[in-house]
Amino acid sequence: MAENNRRKLHNDIECVQTGFANGAAADAPLTDKQKAEMINKAEKAFGEFLDALQCDWKNDPNSSDTPRRVAKAYVNDLWAGRYNEFTDITSFPADGYDGIVIERNIPLTSMCSHHHQTIRGVVHVGYISSPENGRVIGLSKLNRIIEHFGRRGAIQEQLTSAIHQGVDKVCENNLGVIVTIVATHNCVSCRGIKHSGAAMVTTKASGVFRHNGNDARQEFFDSLKINNGGIHI
């Protein structure tokens, strides 16, 4: 973390076991050369995977490039958070502000580490900085934290905790952090029970947001307009 007058740059928010699907890759961040080598290896492996499923991908014009497409999608998009260097996050003094900072409806696209199916939904984040020595961050930086952890393989509970810990680490000397994710899972709609439209809600809270019934937690959920068991924006 570098400091420049009243600004601080944060570039280390990793809080997950290295190498796990929901953690950074062992060699992260990868160079362009390393990514190219990984794509080549993954392309070969996925071709063998299709062979095992008796898919004649080599002669099917719609599937002949599928192994490479899938490999590139994982490295460059779906799991990009495992391989890319995290963008610096700038934090600033709270300067006496002691209210809640809330960002709602942050788009989320992630992947379940169980079946490698898409998780799609929104993230709501709230935090309260200490008015004496707390830090606040630029609004878009919350989005960057979510992209960093979301572009990996994770179950929603793990992802909620990772985002919470990332925000908690960057917003130093905070009085509390709360993260709620509302998302649908393709592993529910496309396999098994095959039910579409079911949404999962997870919340991780610390500090003043920790206990039900307190003012800070109530204000956060009131801002999300929770009614009839669902979150309506």
Model-predicted segments: where are they?
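A domain-level signal for the structural core that forms small-molecule/cofactor-binding pockets
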Residues: M1-I233
